[in-house]
Amino acid sequence: MKKVFRLVAVVAATVMAATAFVAPATAATKVKVGLAYDIGGRGDKSFNDSAAAGLDLAKKNLKVTAREVTVTTGSDSEREDKLRLLAKAGYNPIIAVGFLYAGPIKKVAADYPNVSFGIIDDSSVDLLNVAGLVFAEEQGSYLAGVAAALATKSGKVGYIGGVRIPLLQKFEAGFVAGVKATKKSATVDAKYV
C-alpha cells in the first residue's frame, strides 16, 4: 500500500510540476491537462492507475480540467494520433504514460513547440518542450526487498516481473539489493511472466 501511495504521490507531483510549464491560470484561461495512457488505461491496477490517481488529485487540488485518452492497439501511429488529438484540442501540458511514447511524442512535440509535454519513464527525447519524467524505481523496490527479507522465515523470497524490460530489471535489482543488505544468506527467485 505504501508503494502505491508513493507512486500516486510521485504522479501527482509530476502533474503539478508539468503545470509549472504553463502560464499561471486566470479566470479566463484554465489549465487543460491531457493524459495519454498506454494499453489498459484507467483501471489497469498498475502505472496507468497511478497516473490517473495523480490526475485526480491535480483536478481536485489545482482545479485543472483534463482529458484522458487510451491506446488500444499499442502501435506508434495510434500513440501519435492520441497525442495529436490532445494537442489540437488545446491541452497543455500533455503527459504520456510510458517509455513507448518516446517516438510519437518526439514527432508531435516538434510540431507543437508551444505545448509542454511530459513522458513518464523516458528521458531520451531531446526537445525543449518535452520533460522526461524518470524516477529511481530501484529505491522503492529496495525497501520492498528489505521488508521481504525481514518477513521470510525460510530465507527464500521471490520477485515477479511482468515483462523483462530495463525498467522492471531496475525494480528487480533494487529488490535483490534490499534482500541481500538485510539478510545476506537469503535467496531470491526472480521470474518474469
Residue ranges and their predicted role:
Residues G90-G98, G118-I120:
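Periplasmic-binding protein-like
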